[in-house]
C-alpha cells in the first residue's frame, strides 16, 4: 500500500468518526446543534481529503468502489448543506421528519461505501 493510500485510509477512518458524532448528535437531539454541524463539516473535509489521497495513491479515478464512494460523499455533502441551511433558517427548531430520515439514509449509504472499501482490501481486490 502506497503512503498516499495509507494516508487516505487513516483520514477516512477519522471521517467516519466525525460523521458518526455529527449524525448521532443530530439524531438524538432531533435538532441541528452547533456540535452536530461542526462534526458534519469536519467529516466532509476529511472525506474529500481521503478521496483525493486514494485517487492519487491508486492512480485510478473511476472504479466501482470509487463510484460508490463518490455517491456516498455527495450524500453526506448534501446532508451537511441541508442541515446547515436548516440551522441558519430555523435555529434550534426540531429537524423536519424528511431531513431526519435523509440524514439516516445518507449516513447508512456512506457506511456501506466505507465497509465495502475495507472488504475489497481484505479480499485483495
Placement of each model-derived feature along the sequence:
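Hydrophobic, membrane-facing alpha-helical anchors
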Residues: 12-31
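Loop-to-helix transition at the N-terminal end of transmembrane alpha-helices
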Residues: 29-47
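Hydrophobic transmembrane alpha-helical segments in integral membrane proteins
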Residues: 1-17
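Membrane-helix exit/interface motif
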Residues: 21-25, 46-60, 82-89
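Short alpha-helical packing/oligomerization segments
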Residues: 56-84
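Juxtamembrane boundary at the C-terminal end of a transmembrane helix
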Residues: 115-125
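Individual transmembrane alpha-helices with interfacial aromatic-anchor signatures
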Residues: 99-112
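Divalent metal-coordination and catalytic microenvironments
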Residues: 39, 65, 110
Amino acid at each position: 500500500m502506497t503512503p498516499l493510500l495509507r494516508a487516505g485510509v487513516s483520514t477516512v477512518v477519522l471521517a467516519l468518526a466525525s460523521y458518526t458524532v455529527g449524525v448521532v448528535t443530530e439524531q438524538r437531539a432531533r435538532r441541528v446543534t452547533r456540535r452536530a454541524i461542526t462534526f458534519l463539516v469536519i467529516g466532509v473535509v476529511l472525506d474529500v481529503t481521503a478521496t483525493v489521497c486514494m485517487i492519487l495513491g491508486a492512480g485510478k479515478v473511476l472504479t466501482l468502489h470509487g463510484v460508490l464512494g463518490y455517491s456516498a460523499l455527495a450524500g453526506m455533502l448534501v446532508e451537511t448543506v441541508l442541515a446547515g441551511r436548516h440551522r441558519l433558517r430555523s435555529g434550534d427548531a426540531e429537524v423536519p421528519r424528511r431531513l431526519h430520515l435523509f440524514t439516516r439514509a445518507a449516513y447508512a449509504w456512506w457506511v456501506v461505501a466505507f465497509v465495502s472499501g475495507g472488504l475489497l482490501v481484505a479480499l485483495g481486490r
